[in-house]
Every structure is written in C-alpha cells, then in structure tokens.
Regions:
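N-terminal extension/subdomain marker
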Residues: 1-48, 73, 81, 268, ...
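C-terminal catalytic or substrate-handling cores of phosphate/nucleotide-
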Residues: 38, 42, 106-108, 112-280
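Hydrophobic alpha-helical segments
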Residues: 47-55, 63
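Short, well-ordered loop/turn elements at secondary-structure boundaries
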Residues: 48-51, 76-79, 106-109
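Short His-Asn-centered micro-motif
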Residues: 56-57, 83-87, 115-116
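Short helix/loop capping segments that flank catalytic or ligand/cofactor-binding pockets
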Residues: 64-66, 91-93, 122-123
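A short acidic-Thr-Gly-centered motif at the start of a beta-strand
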Residues: 67-77, 274
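Short active-site loop/helix that positions an aromatic residue
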Residues: 78-81, 87-104
Length: 344
C-alpha cells in the first residue's frame, strides 16, 4: 500500500527505536545514500517513495470494515511491529518531521509492505541476505542513460557488432573488441576539449569512474560528444593505441631523467601528438571523409608521437628544474598541474 510519510515518521523516534523495532542495523548517519534520501525528501518530497518499499513485519494486522469507512481511507491497526527493511528511511522521516514539520511530510508517500505469519519469516530471511541478491550499480551502468551513448548503441557496427556501455565494443568484419575504458581513453585523447583534463582523469580506474559518473558535465561531453559514429570510435581507439605503442618502442636511453615523463605521463604525450597530426573535428565523419585516417594513424602518428615525446621531455626538464622537487619524477609527472605547465 501507499502511506503518507507523516503517518510513519514517528516510528523511528527515540534512542531505543532500533531495539523496539527489531531493525537489522541501526541508523548509519551521514552516508552518501542517507544524505541523498534526506535531500530528496527536503527538495522533492513527492518523489521520496518512488524507489524501494518500506518492509515491516507484524504479529497482527486488523483491517477495518471498508464499507464503514464512508469513502475515507481506512486506518490499519498493527500490533507487534518489526522493521524488516527500511530503518534508514524511517529515521530520515523522523528527523524530517522534527526539522521540516508535518505539513512538509504530507507531500511524501511511502510504499509499504507488512508481512505476517510465516511470510514474515520469509521476508526477514530474504531481506537479511538482500545484499547478496542485488547487483551493485556502478557509474558505468549509468552511461546507458546518456543520449549520446544511446546514439552509438543504435549505430551500424557491422557483421553483428555492437556497442554496449557495460560490455564494450565489437566492431567490423574481424569482430575487434574494445573495452569501455579503452573506448573512453581513446575518445578522451581525441576530444575537442582545449585541455587534457578528461584524459588525465581517465588514466586511473578511479578517475574513469568519476568521468562516467559526470554524465552531462562539460568534461564528460567533451569525450562523449553529440552524434558520435562507430567509425569515429574505432579511429579514436586505434590512434590512442598507436601513440601508446610508439612510446613503448622508444629506446630506454630516452626514458632517463626528465625522460621519465614517457613512462609516468604517456597519455600527455599521446594527447599532444594526436593534436599535432589528426583532424579531430572530423573524427566522427564516416562517408566522404577528406582524410586518410588509416594512413595517418598507422604510418605517420608513431613518428609524430616520438618527436612530441622529445619536445615535451625538454619542456618537462625545465618545469622540473623550476619546481625544485629533487630527483623524484613519478609523483610529479602524474600531476595535472605539471601537465599544464609542460604544455605551456
């Protein structure tokens, strides 16, 4: 049933509410989920009960004569109440009642389940193990809500190929497969954004999760731009891979001293090299492209990347010396501020 939030708000009042309701765990305080629930209740109370139900157990539930209610919503009499699932929500409602008042809570409804008898034991058992029955949601899952990503999913990937933000890409007659991190880093490397911030963020697993979680932001839209094409995605991944391979093939003598930039900040070099050679604005042009993308990526980009590495290593040597941080390069070369200084 749907119940007015104000009718439930007092259930979790008082310091003994956890014991009194037999809840599975006490109030967790200012967790990200609880803060978000409290924010929704404060800003959009009418949507508070749209996701998940409050699950209670009871010794007895007395249902009044509906005919005698004369058109008014009947009140249930519940005895021996137990909170099987949803104590965090109950506590948030209790706090909101004190802070926002009953009139505000009347705008919110909560979906309520009450289980009795043997069904109560079954419900308790399932909810106690609920964390094992739910697939955790990640930022990557949220990509499917992005219209630019959905545009790619509907594209022609040839020969039963596909684009799936969870599984990645299978494209072309040879069924070449790219993971979603590979796709993201390739698109970030060839983005139209004026700076390398997106690619710098995507260099780590934690950073790429943050980028995926920022759907709609300026940084995100610099990577997953409007009307991307399957061919453009393949080009981006191939260009990024080609530049990275060129850096790996450089002789070890170039990777000493300031040359550690090649090992510790390879994506900075790749980003700059791609801008020196490739027509980024035409990345997603498929039919009638004026450029030989295959030739540029396979034949020209490795040499451009090597020359770019030499240029940026010289610049980094000056930056490193000016910063006066001693002989340690690793932590320094990975900093976004250092990338910006090297780019000038």
């Amino acid at each position: 049933m749907s119940v007015s939030a104000v009718e439930l708000a007092s259930l979790a009042a008082g310091p003994d509410a956890v014991r009194r309701l037999g809840a599975r765990r006490g109030f967790l305080g200012e967790t990200p989920a609880n803060r978000e629930l409290a924010r929704i209740l404060r800003d959009r109370p009418e949507t508070f009960g749209s996701v998940h139900s409050l699950v209670l157990g009871a010794d007895e539930v007395h249902v009044p004569d509906l005919a005698a209610s004369r058109g008014f919503a009947p009140s249930l009499q519940v005895f021996g109440l137990e909170c099987i699932d949803g104590f965090q929500r109950l506590r948030i409602l209790s706090d909101a009642l004190a802070g926002l008042g009953a009139e505000h809570l009347e705008k919110a409804t909560v979906r309520l389940e009450i289980h009795c008898g043997r069904y109560r034991d079954v419900a308790r058992s399932l909810h106690d193990a609920g964390h094992r029955l739910v697939n955790a949601t990640t930022a990557q899952d949220g990509l499917i809500r992005c219209p630019n990503v959905r545009w790619l999913m509907a594209g022609d990937w040839e020969k039963e190929g596909f684009f799936d933000p969870r599984r990645g890409v299978s494209a072309g007659p040879h069924r070449r497969c790219f993971s979603m991190p590979e796709v993201t880093r390739g698109l970030a490397c060839l983005s139209l954004a004026p700076g390398p911030e997106a690619l710098h963020l995507a260099t780590t697993d934690e950073g790429i999760e943050r980028l995926w979680g920022a759907v709609g932001s300026e940084l995100y839209l610099g990577v997953f731009r409007d009307r991307m094409s399957p061919l453009g995605v393949v080009r981006a991944v191939e260009a990024y891979d080609s530049a990275r391979a060129a850096l790996r093939n450089l002789p070890g003598r170039l990777k000493k001293g300031a040359g550690h930039l090649i090992d510790y900040a390879p994506d900075l070099i790749c980003w700059k090299a791609c801008r020196r050679l490739l027509p980024l604005e035409d990345l997603h042009v498929e039919a009638g492209s004026r450029h030989d993308w295959g030739g540029m990526i396979e034949d020209q980009l490795p040499a451009v990347t090597a020359r770019t590495a030499e240029d940026l290593v010289r610049r980094y040597e000056a930056v490193h010396r000016a910063r006066g941080d001693g002989p340690h390069y690793k932590g320094e070369a990975e900093l976004l501020d250092v990338w910006r200084e090297v780019l000038g």
